[in-house]
């Protein structure tokens, strides 16, 4: 029962912060000077469409797997990958809804956020983890990658981040943006990387799960460092990028980005 409740909780929280129109996200992406491309990553009988952004750097770079929100691989999520590339990292954002749409399509074929939501709740957890591992393995083997891979996710993707680091010990760090943590103690005991949390102060439903995550991670001897950005709401990394976003969300987004980049720099 509890895992089902957590899934519903994640759904409700993600819905609360979504702006139906994200027209502001695409123009920035289209103006990017960096190399951006679509690739198809195959594992088993699955073809996963992934968005890859490359930095303009001299040396090999650390890679980041970006896990999308409940709305699928949107322009904003692709923009996050580009902004990570701007900061000097290779970013890969898999469309975990690949194959769920008409004619085997993914997010783009589902007709918007409602269509994505209707599919994402029924994705098998093991399939999601396998898709993420395939994306991680792909980017880690790129000639431009230095072999280091971190993972970060937003909302639903934040929850998936916790699960992924539990099942993929090679990850250097996990970044959970306003996602609930696992309460599966044996699963948490498998985590070998530090987990960093980013939460909005005005997000009581998700923040109510933080103490339990802290307790279980401490009991397991794992590193979990949550930070709450006061005044910000759920989804502040996206809402703070919206030109019409509140000052609190904008401030939290900027602080979140700075923290993320500082941690990545130290990996």
Predicted regions and their residues:
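An N-terminal hydrophobic leader/cap segment in hydrolases
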Residues: 5, 11-41, 48-51, 156
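Acidic catalytic loop of the alpha/beta-hydrolase fold
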Residues: 202-207
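C-terminal catalytic histidine-bearing segment of alpha/beta-hydrolase fold enzymes
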Residues: 218, 223-267
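Alpha/beta-hydrolase fold nucleophile elbow
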Residues: 143-154
């Amino acid at each position: 029962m509890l895992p089902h409740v957590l899934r519903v909780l994640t759904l409700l929280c993600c819905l609360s912060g979504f702006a139906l129109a994200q027209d502001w996200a695409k123009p920035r992406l289209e103006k990017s000077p960096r190399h951006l491309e679509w690739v198809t990553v195959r594992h088993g009988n699955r073809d996963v469409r992934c968005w890859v952004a490359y930095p303009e750097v001299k040396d090999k770079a650390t890679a980041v797997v970006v896990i999308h929100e409940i709305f699928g691989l949107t322009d904003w999520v692709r923009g996050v990958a580009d902004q990570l590339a701007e900061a000097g990292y290779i970013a890969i954002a898999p469309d975990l809804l690949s194959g769920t749409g008409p004619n085997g399509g993914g997010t783009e074929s589902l007709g918007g956020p409602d269509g994505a939501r209707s599919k994402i709740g029924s994705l098998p957890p093991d399939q999601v983890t396998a898709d993420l591992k395939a994306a991680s393995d792909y980017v880690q083997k790129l000639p431009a990658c230095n072999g280091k891979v971190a993972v970060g996710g937003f909302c639903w993707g934040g929850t998936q981040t916790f699960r992924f680091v539990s099942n993929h010990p090679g990850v250097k760090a996990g970044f959970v943006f306003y996602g609930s943590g696992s309460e599966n103690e044996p699963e948490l005991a498998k985590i070998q990387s530090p987990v960093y949390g980013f939460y909005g102060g005005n997000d009581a439903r998700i923040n109510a799960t933080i103490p339990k995550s802290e307790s279980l991670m401490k009991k397991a001897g794992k590193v979990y460092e949550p930070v709450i950005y006061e005044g910000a709401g759920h989804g502040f990394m996206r809402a703070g990028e919206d030109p019409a976003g509140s000052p609190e969300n904008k401030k939290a987004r900027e602080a979140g980005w700075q923290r993320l980049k500082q941690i990545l720099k130290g990996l």
